[in-house]
């Protein structure tokens, strides 16, 4: 075996070396030609009397009876069926709620101006949440950067002190210096003092520094860039995943293929010093003076310190490339300004934090946003990424036109399907997981209506993780951006113990108008509008008892598993992110290099 060595210095602590070629040993990709797993819903339910946490996280209960076994003291919370310190409980429960996060702007190309970057923070605990922000190990003053909002309004009020239980705030983390003027630049709202005025994200491929946000109790965190992005035309949002759920094995997922306005991107983040990251690239990594390049299918090694991120932005996608680290890391996939499709008339920044490989699933439900012009068959792109050779896919109710039925390790497949034409896709077993994303096309189509229809300029390219059914949870809190004309949430619920459980949305009560998905009767979906053309969304109930959904903080819960994805769009602008997710380990067999 030939050994190649490439070294480079990244700042003072970041280096890379290309090491020996991949082995032909594919042990981790053993084929399994057995039939697909039998549907669990066809088997009789067995009593499950394990201990678990109550929905409010305040008690340990019996799963089969709901009987309270232990009520947690006020200063503790339930996690992994044990009363413990709140942050430890959140880490044990492995969800998107947590106490330690890293994130950075998805401004991967400096051709686009440094606009306002904001974070939506929701206190999901029963105690006040204290928030701290740092970068490069230095604390950042946020005393003038935290604001409250009113449901359905863009008005902001300064917030001081801790976030109350169940409360939410917007933290304005970054903006350009005062006086900046540029086309499509969106500054932070008047009266806001952003926490920072500099950008520590590299221009295209390079090394940058991420923000670190920590709290004393669990919160839900979303990064929005730019805030008020409906006027920037390039907005994106991502649910930020806590450090406690990071992993040491990943597969790179870019947001979309390259075009003349934008290139596929990945940001790999370290939370500890002396983190060693090895990438097995599916295509050549084009290096520069800051980052060592590497030929396709030959591993390249990088060293990172806490809070650093390695950013790779290039025309050739690296989707399907394996990333392995000696300490927990995470990755954000995206595109510096994607056109979907590549002939679309406008582009948009894409960014999603990608779950580590061990959290990928073998079953997903595909269903999209409320159609932009009323056509439930509006073609919406889906993308699949496979992790194992010999991955076989089955669908219900039918195979969508163009959808793959077999995939190999590192392979990417895309197809379009009606936004309301819901389907279930599953592989032969849990050890053949896939990643699935949903996308929105440009609001003006391709400008001519030849390959992509126009939607009157509404919406723009977007990219969002679809949550695996094995990662559904039973409560979420999230924030709908009031600066967008349209905000809608898509909810999918799974049958639990032979029955569908009510799903409660704070502005609506128990949701109705569920539609079946597939043929086995295991899933249903519904949608709720939170705004329409800047006006309030759906109304529930009659007379004095009627309630109206609006933008701002949203809370949902159920006694059964479900998922919720928020979509927002405006003229040539869009954003989307999951309202939350469990982050359970679903896979036992490690990744192996893709040859």
Task: Describe each PLM feature range.
Residues 51, 84-320, 324-422, 426-595:
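Conserved functional hotspot residues at active sites or interaction interfaces
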Residues 7-10, 119:
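Beta-propeller blade repeat segments, especially FG-GAP/WD-type strand-to-loop junctions
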Residues 33-94:
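Cysteine-rich, disulfide-bonded extracellular modules and peptides in secreted proteins
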Residues 19-20, 27-34, 40, 57, ...:
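A subset of signal/propeptide-processing and intrinsically disordered low-complexity segments
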Residues 28-30, 36-43, 66, 104, ...:
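A generic signature of intrinsically disordered, low-complexity regions enriched in glycine/proline
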Residues 10, 19, 27, 39, ...:
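Feature targets compositionally biased, intrinsically disordered low-complexity regions
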Residues 2-5, 15-50:
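Ser/Thr-rich, Pro/Gly/Ala-heavy low-complexity intrinsically disordered linkers and tails
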Residues 5, 71-73, 506, 510:
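Short, solvent-exposed coil/turn linker segments
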């Amino acid at each position: 075996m030939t050994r190649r060595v490439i070294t480079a210095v990244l700042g003072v602590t970041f280096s890379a070396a290309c090491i020996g070629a991949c082995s032909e040993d594919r042990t981790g990709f053993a084929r399994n030609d057995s039939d697909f797993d039998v549907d669990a819903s066809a088997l009789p339910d067995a009593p499950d009397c394990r201990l678990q946490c109550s929905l409010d996280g305040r008690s340990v209960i019996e799963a089969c009876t709901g009987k309270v076994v232990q009520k947690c003291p006020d200063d503790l919370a339930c996690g992994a069926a044990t009363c413990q310190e709140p942050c430890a409980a959140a880490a044990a429960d492995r969800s998107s709620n947590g106490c330690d996060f890293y994130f950075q702007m998805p401004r991967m190309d400096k051709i686009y101006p440094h606009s306002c970057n904001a974070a939506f923070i929701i206190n999901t605990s029963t105690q006040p949440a204290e928030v701290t922000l740092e970068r490069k190990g230095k604390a950042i003053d946020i005393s003038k950067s935290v604001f409250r909002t009113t449901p359905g309004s863009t008005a902001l009020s300064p917030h001081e002190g801790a976030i109350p239980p169940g409360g939410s705030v917007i933290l304005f983390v970054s903006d350009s210096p005062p006086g900046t003027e540029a086309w499509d630049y969106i500054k932070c709202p008047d009266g806001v003092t952003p926490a920072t005025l500099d950008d520590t994200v590299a221009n295209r491929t390079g090394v940058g520094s991420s923000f670190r946000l920590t709290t004393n109790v669990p919160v839900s965190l979303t990064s929005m860039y730019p805030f008020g992005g409906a006027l920037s035309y390039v907005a994106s949002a991502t649910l930020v995943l806590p450090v406690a759920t990071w992993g040491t094995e990943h597969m790179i997922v870019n947001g979309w293929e390259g075009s003349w306005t934008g290139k596929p991107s990945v940001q790999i983040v370290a939370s500890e010093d002396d983190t060693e990251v090895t990438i097995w690239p599916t295509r050549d990594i084009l290096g520069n003076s800051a980052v060592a390049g590497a030929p396709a299918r030959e591993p390249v090694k990088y060293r990172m310190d806490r809070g650093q991120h390695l950013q790779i932005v290039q025309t050739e996608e690296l989707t399907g490339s394996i990333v392995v680290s000696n300490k927990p890391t995470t990755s954000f996939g995206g595109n510096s300004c994607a056109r979907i499709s590549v002939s679309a008339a406008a582009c948009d920044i894409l960014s999603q934090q990608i779950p580590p490989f061990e959290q990928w699933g073998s079953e997903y439900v595909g269903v999209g946003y409320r159609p932009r012009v009323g056509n439930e068959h509006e073609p919406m792109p889906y993308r699949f990424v496979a992790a194992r050779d010999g991955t076989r896919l089955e669908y219900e109710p039918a195979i969508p036109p163009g959808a793959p039925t077999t995939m190999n390790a590192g392979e990417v497949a895309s197809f379009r399907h009606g936004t309301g034409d819901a389907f279930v896709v599953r592989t032969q077993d849990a050890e053949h997981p896939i990643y699935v994303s949903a996308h929105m096309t440009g609001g003006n189509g391709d400008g001519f209506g030849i390959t992509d229809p126009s939607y009157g300029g509404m919406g723009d390219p977007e990219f969002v993780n679809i949550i695996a059914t094995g990662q559904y949870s039973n409560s979420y809190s999230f924030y709908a951006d009031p600066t967008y004309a349209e905000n809608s949430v898509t909810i999918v619920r799974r049958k639990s113990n032979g029955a569908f459980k009510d799903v409660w949305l704070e502005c609506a009560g128990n949701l109705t108008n569920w539609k079946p998905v597939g043929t086995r009767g295991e899933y249903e979906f519904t949608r709720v509008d939170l705004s329409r053309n800047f006006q309030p969304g759906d109304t529930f109930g009659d007379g004095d008892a009627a309630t109206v959904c609006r933008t701002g903080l949203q809370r949902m819960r159920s006694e059964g598993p479900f998922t919720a994805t928020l979509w927002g769009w405006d003229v040539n602008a869009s954003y989307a992110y999951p309202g939350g997710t469990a982050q359970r380990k679903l896979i036992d067999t490690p990744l192996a290099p893709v040859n």
